[in-house]
Amino acid sequence: MGFTVNHIDSTLAPYAEKSYQHYLADAKEYGITDAERYAQDKTLKEIKQGVQSYTYELAQTQNALGQTPFTTISFGLDTSKWGREITRAILEDRMSPDNRDVFPKLVFMYRGEINGDPESPNYDLYKLSLECSSKKLYPDYLSFSADDIKGEHYRRDVYERSGQTIAPMGCRAHLSPFINPETGKDVTDGRFNIGAISLNPVKFALESKDINGDFDQEKFDALVEKYSNMVFDILNWRYERVGNLYGSSNPLFWCEGGAWQRIKTTQQVKESNLLDGATASIGYTGLYEMVNAMKGDNWQNVSDDERHQLQAEFLSHVNRIREERSKADKHPYALYSTPAESLVFTWEKLLTKQYGVISGVTDRDYLTNSFHQPVWIHSSAIDKIDYEKEFHQLAKGGHISYAEFNYGVAPTSLEAIVNYAMRQGMYFGVNVINSVCDDCGQHGDFLMTCDHCGSENILVVERVCGYLTYSKRSGVQAVNDGKWSEIKERVRHGVKRGQLGSASYAESH
């Protein structure tokens, strides 16, 4: 998880207008010819420099472990003059060949009549965004349209009801809809998540065998109940713990406008409604391996439909427990698809140590992330979207899907795929390998050595989970062994329905 500045275009646009009026007044005072053009040029320059300074300051801010703050900005729906120019400046800054930033994460908010349709006012910015994604991976795309979802879709429904946008916190965490009881209005900004704990359904499946080694569904369901309730007991304690904090523990957040409601430094959080708008999340990972563990030696014969059904049944079961505990504890719990940057490696090693190497379960260096189609499966991007779209609706507290493409994939191809994902109401990202050679300056799709000069002194930007990171710095691996194995096994997805993807990096090099 991380920190998000939602609708940054709309947030900053009024200040750009103030700058414009300031420069316009100066131009008129000093008799500058074409005062409007002067004021506009100065304001555009200020916007550009502001974006550059903002990203630079974030990159230079690090904790004792050398970590950069996990930050996200969302934009794309503001059709005002300055809102559009702020969006344009963000995209053009990230597209610069010299820009190697991975933070802030960029999220383009999609709504057909605003930026997705060719005749929409911000369509040019959507096209620019796709061009940026084709080489720099970001922005990701967040749907506020969901045209193919006929039932409830909470982001779209909140937006259509109130005009408010729900943006992800960090890479994928989402807050549930919340209405301020005092005003009756939706609250989407100034809210927060107080923690996430993950389940290990692969272990549950391995533990759910009878004396003959056959899978026992009742035992599995009992383990899901037991450990889910254990998680909610801990999260309930977490709410109590946060509720006992005083405003003075973090005055910038609790007292000075960071949160959606303010308290005094001498007040406890529980004396307000602040926690009514907070969530705590139950996560999970490894659904692909969970099904394989259920099926034992027959796992290779499981159809996609059966696998999909078993994964959906698990999530539905956890959701039922979540709803019961939310009602009993009076807290807004959420089901969250854990990013598991290191957990997929750690859990695989622990499972292997306890159960040995099991075909389809512990025979790789990692578990498959959350509900995702495994990275080594050859399919089209559209087919992958179809496989994963239901899980976005089941795990509303955190989700993202992405597809793999070649560096510099044609924006027109991306547009068709992103449009399809947006019609399904998804949160969707574009994956390419974005590498830079520190010796010759070559940009491209290479993971081990520069494809121009052969140097190993390369910087590789990859999506490790929802965030981008440097998987290699100066030619040295910078992620855990499990994630590195997964990155090398990723296949490129076809751009048309039914079109199989190209070979993985390991197969093609």
Where are these regions (language model features)?
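Short intrinsically disordered, low-complexity coil segments enriched in acidic
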Residues: 1-5, 284, 311, 335, ...
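Conserved catalytic cores of very large enzyme subunits
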Residues: 1-276, 297, 304-308, 312-460, ...
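Glycine-centered flexibility sites
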Residues: 283-286, 397, 466, 482
